[in-house]
């Protein structure tokens, strides 16, 4: 109220739209005299109402001179009918892997993992300070797990997927290969063994 008393402008109420329309949508009135036309915001409104613009009366479509309707039908009928496109077989690669390839890939990885397991167990058994051997075993297990997960991320390559399964199961193959060596060392001191490697 203090600002209004000092100012010479009268404040406008919020609901007073006639004196201050603001950004309210409105239709402008183009009054050009006696023959003024009402402004249309959309050109399609007259078409919907069935009216037409002045001077835009559609002309009747005339047939070309010397051409009968039957002739035009014959021309259209003489064109060949559109044929459907046949499917084309594109050579691609298998999205699956044959079982013998899978077995070969996994066995190849397991043979390498078995050699690693035998070496690590032999080193752990004969060394006095077993800290380094245990640390290498931990690094080997982590490397197999991470490597298998990274290989499994390759899309659309079933051979790489089989390789990832072999790499992730590598530590189990290493344990299975080191188990007979452990049984052999155990049976050197114990007499109750089967085939010299299986204690009972």
From Swiss-Prot:
It is found in: Cell membrane. Residues 47-67 are annotated as: Disordered. The chain crosses the membrane at residues 102-122, 134-154, 159-179. It comes from the Bacteria. The keyword Transmembrane applies. It is a multi-pass membrane protein. This is Protein Rv0461. It comes from Mycobacterium tuberculosis (strain ATCC 25618 / H37Rv). The lineage of its organism: Bacteria, Bacillati, Actinomycetota, Actinomycetes, Mycobacteriales.
